[in-house]
């Protein structure tokens, strides 16, 4: 087995990371408040849409499923699924599910450890189903610190511009975003994206304040 580092997309979040790992010619962040990413004009939101994109790109020889569904299959069913597809994407969501919620975000490291155990079980099941090549990827990373977040952890500036479409603690999507000393602005072309949605990311590892 080999472990290789790779640079992810910016901004580093689920929708863009998952879309970038699909076959694509053009990635566009949707011009609305959803943060959804379009792959060659199609929404990549959800496993069903991602499976459709995979199937179209491979003449029906690729699909997507989730960890829980595959692990619930018996050996014959899992073998048939692999036999019907040259490529199979299997999504595992424990880390995101834990880390994205305020009441459980402190358990992110524990979730990462449990995920490693899940992946070992998954690899064994895939090997028993005659899978020949297995690649494990991550669609984005996360910032974790084992202490309470302090005032100094937040950026002292707030994103502003003609239109703020989507806010996250680590980035903002919008149009006509105004330059700021505490934020780094990227045009879509600088990030390998199409469309006209711009991105701002706090400098260093500072967070942005969210209302509510």
Annotated model-derived regions:
Residues 1-212:
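Feature captures the catalytic ectodomains and active-site-proximal regions of enzymes
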């Amino acid at each position: 087995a080999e472990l290789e580092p790779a640079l992810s997309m910016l901004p580093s979040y689920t929708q863009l990371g998952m879309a970038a790992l699909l076959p694509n010619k053009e990635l566009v962040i949707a011009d609305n408040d959803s943060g959804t990413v379009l792959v060659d004009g199609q929404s990549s939101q959800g496993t069903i849409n991602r499976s459709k994109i995979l199937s179209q790109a491979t003449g029906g020889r690729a699909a997507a499923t989730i960890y829980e569904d595959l692990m619930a299959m018996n050996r014959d069913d899992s073998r048939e699924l692999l036999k019907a597809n040259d490529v199979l994407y299997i999504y595992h969501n424990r880390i995101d599910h834990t880390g994205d919620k305020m009441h459980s975000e402190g358990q992110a490291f524990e979730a990462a450890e449990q995920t490693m155990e899940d992946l070992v079980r998954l690899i064994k099941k895939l090997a028993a189903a005659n899978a020949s090549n297995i690649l494990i990827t991550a669609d984005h990373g996360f910032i974790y610190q084992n202490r309470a977040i302090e005032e100094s952890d937040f950026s002292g500036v707030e994103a502003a511009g003609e239109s703020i479409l989507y806010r996250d603690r680590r980035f903002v999507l919008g149009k006509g975003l105004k330059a700021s000393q505490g934020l780094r602005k990227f045009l879509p072309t600088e990030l390998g994206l199409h469309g006209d949605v711009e991105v701002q990311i706090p400098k260093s590892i500072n967070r942005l304040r969210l209302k509510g």
